[in-house]
């Protein structure tokens, strides 16, 4: 087990060495039955991630395009959410009684390109990152407590924005724990 953890940490550190070319964010839902989760945890996490990617691609200088390459877990759900977000996304008003704004995601280039993670080192790395984020939010006794920290500068702290300060940089805990 120790050797595997060492290899795992080395893979995460290698991503950290590639920063700022490689940047990582993660959305973790520690409680699937939280009252703030509107549909199901997987859909809500994808929705939060797509919202964040839309803002990131729009505000970045120069503006950048986004291509989603998820694993084969939920292809229909992810495709449906991405298509809806690309054309019809809305942002609610920040003020009571205000009107919502249309905020489409035109920088999402194509439908998600689903791949089997067994066939892609890129997606295996994404699985490592997702597991590191999950285990940082929900630790396990037999694993090191802060695997996410191994990513170093690759963990995109800007993802947290105005979110609670107790979240690790680049990890969005959804729904947040302020409720």
Regions found by a protein language model. Give the residues of each.
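Phosphate-ester processing/binding pockets and catalytic centers
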Residues: 1-179
């Amino acid at each position: 087990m120790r050797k595997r953890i060492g290899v795992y940490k080395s893979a995460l550190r290698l991503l950290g060495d590639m920063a700022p070319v490689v940047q990582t964010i993660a959305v973790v839902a520690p409680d699937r039955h939280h009252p703030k989760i509107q549909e199901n945890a997987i859909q809500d996490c994808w929705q939060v991630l797509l919202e964040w990617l839309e803002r990131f691609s729009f505000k970045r200088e120069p503006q950048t395009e986004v291509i989603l390459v998820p694993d084969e877990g939920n292809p229909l759900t992810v495709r449906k959410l991405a298509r809806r977000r690309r054309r019809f996304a809305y942002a609610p008003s920040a003020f009571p009684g205000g009107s919502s704004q249309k905020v489409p995601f035109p920088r999402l280039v194509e439908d998600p390109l689903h791949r089997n993670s067994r066939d892609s080192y890129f997606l295996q790395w994404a699985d490592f990152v997702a597991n590191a984020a999950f285990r940082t939010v929900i630790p396990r006794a037999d694993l090191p407590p802060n695997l996410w920290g191994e990513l170093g500068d690759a963990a995109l702290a800007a993802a947290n924005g105005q979110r609670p300060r107790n979240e690790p940089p680049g990890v969005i805990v959804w729904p947040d724990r302020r409720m």
